[in-house]
């Protein structure tokens, strides 16, 4: 008990120290700022020949470069092991659940290693987790102020934008609008599963050039989940579809100069406008998307045909539910049955209470009247508390309204019903506002706060506003940009030493292990880039954007929305394998056309 008191006292004084430090205004103004990370010019290696020699020189100049890259490598390896962590987490949870069922463990207990492995298996937390390790390394090698200056200087606009646009794009009005548009196109081809699959995989990515890639990814992934993944296709088809989606989204934003993050990073610097993007990238991307879709469709045509009956049955069920099942009458009948059960249950509670009270009050023979009255009063309160606690778990609907716990309808987001046009229009306005102000976080974040209020007011036409997936994706991207800012010391020399084809190939490969926007941004810092080299590095960056979850900013959004359809999450190795052929097709389109 003494040790516990000392620990509490220590935490209290630690909190006071932090408050005093904050109240003091932080670091002194005379603290000398360390240039971290060092500028490329500070290496003075222009006269050094050979990539190996340049990199060795930069490591000797700033040893922390190697540390930062080793931490980044560890984070990448962690992403490839995430499915293994989830496998053991699920296995241990199942074993612990059996112990609970057999009475060998308490119902409220949990197996801590399983929870830790589940946390480590969440791809969205990987880079944020390793950013903590990187931060500790910066503080150890330099100091606290260097760390603060670095993280304060990192541009978090893209992670913040993805959080906001993903929240808006996943709203019921936007999804209904997108579904209505795509259903009209799919209806031209009789509204079959094949028509829906091809429409989503073609139109969704191309829309990314106008509504931004993260929004296109969110809409496409949610529609694929509803129309395709719910049908439980084979493991091969699942991976082929998500890999193709990632590749298509990555190149689908190249019809314009403002929608794809890797293009946005260079467009202003190199004066690339909309006509330039469409004539040099856009039409080639469309050909690549159509070609890749056709190839995957032909490979899995037999399976799509076998899934058609299941798809038609699910569509028919939805139509029958909307037209013929009168849910209001059913709810009324169920409510009456609930009241009858509630009456019987209340009688049973009274019987239990009477028996327990008689047994408890036998102790009154040893107590005076005051103590006996107190015992009776305590029993009444304890019984009422236990009754409410038990009913909250088993039959919360039978409790009085003021005692009921807040519950959410698990099928609320799957309900039928249309959304008024004016609500759709307001949601489109929110998205347009966000896209127009993409460079101004204070403005588009304020717009999101306004949207949350609007969604609350119009709740009957909304799905549950679930901020967890967007926030996790934002955490992922935030961690990635913190790591990416310290990788330029080796990426820039590699990009600057290559000719067109090797540069495009290298950009594609590097993109698999670093965000493609970071790759293209670093290319703007390389002096003497010709127009053909500029084309090659951007083409390589967008081509490789589907190889891994970290390759393109919208990928974590798709991963977060679809991961539950894959056992133990999405395997990075299988994703890489199934994305290889579509990536080759896109690369050939950009290189040969």
Write out the residue ranges for each language-model feature.
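Hydrophobic mid-bilayer segments of alpha-helices in multi-pass membrane transport proteins
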Residues: 66-87, 122-139, 155-167, 219, ...
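Juxtamembrane and boundary regions of transmembrane helices in multi-pass small-molecule transporters
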Residues: 22-30, 66-70, 75-91, 243, ...
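Membrane-interfacial loop-to-helix junctions in multi-pass transporters
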Residues: 61-65, 153-160, 186-199, 231-242, ...
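Transmembrane helical segments that form the transport core of multi-pass membrane transport proteins
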Residues: 99-105, 140-152, 170-179, 200, ...
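Hydrophobic transmembrane alpha-helices that form the pore/transport pathway of multi-pass ion
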Residues: 190, 194-254, 265-266, 521-539, ...
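N-terminal secretory/membrane targeting signals
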Residues: 1-25
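Interfacial loop-to-helix junctions that mark the boundaries of transmembrane helices
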Residues: 54-65, 116-124, 145-159, 274-284, ...
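Short helix-coil transition sites and intra-membrane helix breaks within transmembrane domains
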Residues: 168-179, 207-219, 252-260, 509-522, ...
